[in-house]
């Protein structure tokens, strides 16, 4: 499989050896801007600063289960555009231009509520918050509704935190959770290896 390096370390000539640096990576699921996102993610810690750069996970099945009925009704059968122009650090990817109109966001279109084929449970499928857009809604309505959903879905009661030690390996179901990374001291070293399992099932509501 392809191995990606996630690191803030630079080589002797000042070139980063990996991606994402030392800043915060906001809540997201990996590569949901693709029609078939990865079904699982794997992270392996080679070097990590003590109790910094923690990774947090939010359970989207629990978040949907406890979602107020009024919000469940509002998002029923809604389709969300998942932004492909920016990475999880909020940086614009090469080949894209910045836009202030979420309705013009490039990326895959997925149901806001999907079903886990193994458990048959419904779950929120949010991707990432910035630049997302709910099809068919006025922009301000889409923004307000997404803000409400995200505020609910990322409550601490739905989350779990991985405090990394060197040698830790973590695997998760990419479509079932959101994850984010804390920023950490840029003078420390953090080197992670990441790979993913290819998605093989069309996302269903």
Predicted features and spans:
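Fe(II)/2-oxoglutarate oxygenase catalytic core
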Residues: 1-171, 175-205
């Amino acid at each position: 499989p392809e191995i990606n390096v996630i690191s803030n370390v630079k080589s002797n000539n000042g070139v980063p050896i990996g991606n994402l640096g030392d800043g915060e990576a906001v809540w997201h699921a990996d590569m949901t801007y693709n029609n078939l996102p990865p079904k699982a993610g794997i992270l392996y810690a080679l070097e990590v600063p003590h109790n910094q750069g923690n990774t947090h996970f939010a359970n989207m099945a629990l978040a949907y289960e406890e979602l107020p009925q009024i919000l469940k009704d509002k998002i029923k059968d809604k389709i969300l555009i998942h932004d492909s122009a920016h990475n999880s650090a909020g940086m614009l990817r090469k080949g894209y231009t910045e836009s202030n109109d979420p309705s013009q966001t490039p990326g895959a279109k997925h149901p806001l509520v999907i079903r886990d084929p193994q458990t048959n449970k419904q779950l929120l499928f949010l991707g990432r918050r910035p630049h997302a857009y709910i099809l068919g809604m006025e922009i301000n309505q889409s923004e307000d509704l997404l803000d409400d959903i995200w505020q609910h879905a990322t409550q601490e009661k739905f989350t779990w935190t991985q405090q990394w030690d060197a040698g830790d390996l973590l695997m998760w179901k990419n479509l079932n959770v959101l994850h984010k990374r804390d920023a950490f001291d840029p003078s420390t070293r953090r080197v992670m290896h990441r790979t993913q399992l290819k998605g093989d099932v069309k996302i269903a509501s």
